Amino acid sequence: MKKKLGLLAMVVALMAITAGCSEVNQPITPKSTGIWNEYFVYPLSQLITYFANLFGSNYGLAIVVTTLIIRFALLPLMIKQTKSTKAMQALQPEMVKLKEKYSSKDQATQQKLQQEMMQLYQKNGVNPLAGCLPIFVQMPILFAFYHAIMRTSEISKHTFLWFDLGQADPYYILPVVAAITTFIQQKLAMAGTAGQNPQMAMMLWLMPIMILIFAINFPAALSLYWVVGNIFGIAQMYLIKGPEIKASKAGGSSK
């Protein structure tokens, strides 16, 4: 069920991206219409602008601060999602035994398997859907922030550190840092799950490569958002999964 929900989450994300692509080059203004623009993108654009004005038209610093605010706001959801994932992982040995017991693919056997799986969840107080809800809540917020960065026209007129916020980083520093921090964040997220999910192992390498390609071709403002978000995510993983990360490192060093 979780695999199906994960696939559904990916489909929803793809639909959101596809639907938003037609608007991503249109500046966000008070006159922008639609629920998406009025209640998601424009408020985040205004939040960036507010901090930029507060910091003397420093839009780079405004993106950093707004990213941190959003990440802190989403932190309780991430903690809940991680706890749910850990609870599901703890049940994996028993789940494997059930699947071996009911290995036949006929409908009656599969129904019996589903019934016993649900009983196992209830017995251990685990909700298989609890880990998916935070994903669906986070996706529109993070995607709206991406839109706010891309569609706030004032951002492209400013610089931050060594780069122009409206252009790709000419030295490729941000794209490389974004890719590396993506890899580290995912590596930490996988701590304690090695060998349990080959698809996650593949994504460990695929996601950083995708981020690198996107960051090379997108404005540096978006790369800055990725880097700050990833660094926060790394700290978040140490906060939530500290013991597992230490155990994973100890296991790796002993081999």
Swiss-Prot record:
Keyword Lipoprotein recorded: yes
Residue stretches spanning the membrane: 59-79, 129-149, 160-180, 202-222, 223-243
Pfam families: 60KD_IMP (PF02096)
Compartments it resides in: Cell membrane
Domain of life: Bacteria
Cellular component, GO annotation: plasma membrane
The keyword Transmembrane helix belongs to this UniProt entry's keyword annotation: yes
Membrane topology field: Multi-pass membrane protein
One BP annotation, GO: protein transport
Keywords on record: Cell membrane, Chaperone, Lipoprotein, Membrane, Palmitate, Protein transport, Signal, Transmembrane, Transmembrane helix, Transport
Residues carrying lipid (S-diacylglycerol cysteine): C21
Residues in the signal sequence: 1-20
Listed GO MF terms: membrane insertase activity
Lipid-acceptor residues (N-palmitoyl cysteine): C21
Protein family (similarity comment): Belongs to the OXA1/ALB3/YidC family. Type 2 subfamily.
PANTHER family: CYTOCHROME C OXIDASE ASSEMBLY PROTEIN COX18, MITOCHONDRIAL, OXA1
Family matches, as HAMAP family: YidC_type2 (MF_01811)
Function: Required for the insertion and/or proper folding and/or complex formation of integral membrane proteins into the membrane. Involved in integration of membrane proteins that insert both dependently and independently of the Sec translocase complex, as well as at least some lipoproteins.
Protein name (record): Membrane protein insertase YidC 2
Source organism: Bacillus anthracis
Gene: yidC2
